[in-house]
Regions:
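Nucleotide/phosphate-binding catalytic cleft detector across ATP-hydrolyzing
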Residues: 1-8, 16-132, 140
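Primarily the dimerization/phosphotransfer
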Residues: 11
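Active-site-adjacent helix-turn-beta-strand microarchitecture at beta-sheet edges
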Residues: 136
Length: 140
C-alpha cells in the first residue's frame, strides 16, 4: 500500500511517499520545496503572502499524491503553524486554496514521530536523536 506524508515546516515543505508491504517500508518519493514560512511571520502573525506560499505548495504536493491514487495522505505542520497567533485563519486559507489543511502536531508528537522514523531506517538500538528544525528542536 502507498502512503504519502506532507510535512509543513518553518523552512520547507516536504512530500514523502512510501510503499509499505509485509512490514517493510520503502521510500519512493522525497520532494522538498524551500518556502521559508518563518520569514512570513511578523509579530507572531503569518502574513497573507506566507499563507499563499504554504497553500500553493501544499496544494501542489497534495495533487501529486492524489495523481498516484494514494489512499492515505497525511498533512502535518510543526512549529511553522504551531507558533503563529492567527493559526485558524491560516488553516482556513490553506483549506480553501489547497482543499486540505494540515494537522498541527505538538512538539511531543513531532519528537515521537522523529523517533519512530529514525529507529526504523537507522536500526538504532541506543542513542540520541536531535531534530533541528527552523522553528523548533526536538531531542529523543
Amino acid at each position: 500500500m502507498l502512503y504519502a506524508v506532507i510535512d509543513v515546516g518553518s523552512n520547507s515543505v516536504r512530500l514523502s511517499v512510501y510503499q509499505c508491504e509485509n512490514g517493510n517500508i520503502q521510500p519512493l518519493i522525497d520532494k522538498k520545496d524551500t518556502v521559508g514560512l518563518a520569514g512570513y511571520v511578523e509579530n507572531g502573525i503569518m502574513v497573507e503572502e506566507g499563507m499563499k506560499k504554504a497553500a500553493e505548495t501544499i496544494g501542489n504536493f497534495y495533487t501529486i499524491a492524489r495523481n498516484f491514487n494514494i489512499p492515505s495522505i497525511s498533512v502535518f505542520a510543526t512549529a511553522s503553524l504551531r507558533n503563529v497567533a492567527n493559526q485558524e485563519e491560516v488553516l482556513r486559507y490553506i483549506r480553501e486554496y489547497a482543499g486540505v489543511a494540515p494537522e498541527i502536531i505538538t512538539g511531543e508528537e513531532e519528537a515521537r514521530l522523529d523517533f519512530i522514523g529514525s529507529t526504523h531506517f537507522l536500526k538504532m538500538e541506543r542513542g540520541i536523536l536531535v531534530d533541528i528544525g527552523g522553528g523548533s528542536t526536538e531531542l529523543v
